[in-house]
């Protein structure tokens, strides 16, 4: 199968690209720069390059129509302009979906579990939290609507933490916050749970959803259902040799900044349905072990 991947040079996309090629698929990766193109080629020389970015809608349409399937992993990670980034994502998604109408080709849209209702174990049948302000939740629903327009749309939801060597997201940011503050914090009792998955476990799941997934189905790429945030803070404290402390709710935003909505949220997520349907079984180490083994600020 010829597969077009956005975000192919990224933390998750690079693992997915390698997995697909090693499984016999032909991959075309979107590259916004010479650096991204070189990285894709360094991952696997067999990968082909399509130059452009998520704002180049005609390029995205070309990549989609000339492929047998699409995995949309690309996203502009600018948390200071998050709404604008979500709008870029929406337009890119719609452009590709429109170009695939009537083809019945698989289109995998990637969303996060932050848009699910908190304080319960969410499963694949759970819809988007109606109170969610995460704009990507709307794009997930738009993508699913194309199942009635001749596109085999499928959703893959990723947990709060996708971890592994090279991670530049939440855990490293939390470590920098802890170092600057002189303490590794959690909010209140710290019993709120984070779901997690290792980046190398995401790749087989995306391949299975591409090869065996069903139209209109949602899949959860979750290796660990829920890790108490206090445990994450404790391990970070051990690594940095700083005390672990509870941060009062009223002080959470001043301590954690834009991460406050994540560190205060209870978001356990089940992947039982995904595992049963596709036979996916995560093989890599868990988040806490990974932090101990592979995370530092050196």
Curated annotation (Swiss-Prot):
Give the GO cellular component terms, alphabetically. Answer: cytoplasm
Induction / repression: Highly induced under sulfur starvation conditions.
The cross-references to InterPro entries, in alphabetical order and at most eight, read: Epimerase_deHydtase, NAD(P)-bd_dom_sf, NAD(P)-dependent_oxidoreduct
Q: Which Gene3D superfamilies match?
A: NAD(P)-binding Rossmann-like Domain
PANTHER family in the record: PROTEIN YEEZ (PTHR48079), PUTATIVE-RELATED (PTHR48079:SF9)
According to its UniProt record, which protein family does this protein belong to?
Belongs to the NAD(P)-dependent epimerase/dehydratase family.
The protein in question is named Uncharacterized protein YLL056C
């Amino acid at each position: 199968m010829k597969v077009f991947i956005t975000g192919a040079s990224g933390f998750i996309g690079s693992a997915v690209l390698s997995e697909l090629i090693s499984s016999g698929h032909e991959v075309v990766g979107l590259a916004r720069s010479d650096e991204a193109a070189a990285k894709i080629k360094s991952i696997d020389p067999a990968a082909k390059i399509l130059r452009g970015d998520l704002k180049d809608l005609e390029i995205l349409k070309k990549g989609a129509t000339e492929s047998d399937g699409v995995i949309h992993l690309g996203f502009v990670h600018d948390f200071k302009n998050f709404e604008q980034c979500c709008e870029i994502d929406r337009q890119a998604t719609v452009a590709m979906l429109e170009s695939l109408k009537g083809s019945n080709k698989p289109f995998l849209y990637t969303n996060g579990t932050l848009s699910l209702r908190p304080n319960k174990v969410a499963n694949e049948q759970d819809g988007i939290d109606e109170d969610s302000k995460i704009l990507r939740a709307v794009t997930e629903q738009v993508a699913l609507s194309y199942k009635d327009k001749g596109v085999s749309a499928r959703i893959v939801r990723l947990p709060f933490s996708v971890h592994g060597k090279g991670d530049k997201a939440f855990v490293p940011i939390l470590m920098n916050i802890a170092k600057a503050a002189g303490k590794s914090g959690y909010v209140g009792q710290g019993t709120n749970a984070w779901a997690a998955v290792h980046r190398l476990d995401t790749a087989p799941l995306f391949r299975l959803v591409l090869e065996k997934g069903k139209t209109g189905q949602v899949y959860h790429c979750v290796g660990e259902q829920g890790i108490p945030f206090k445990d994450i803070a404790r391990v970070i404290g051990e690594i940095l040799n700083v005390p672990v402390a509870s941060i009062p709710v009223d002080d959470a935003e001043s301590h954690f900044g834009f991460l406050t909505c994540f560190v205060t949220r209870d978001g356990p997520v089940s992947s039982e349905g995904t595992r049963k349907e596709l036979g996916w079984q995560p093989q890599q180490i868990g988040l806490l072990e990974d932090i101990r083994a592979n995370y530092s600020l050196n």
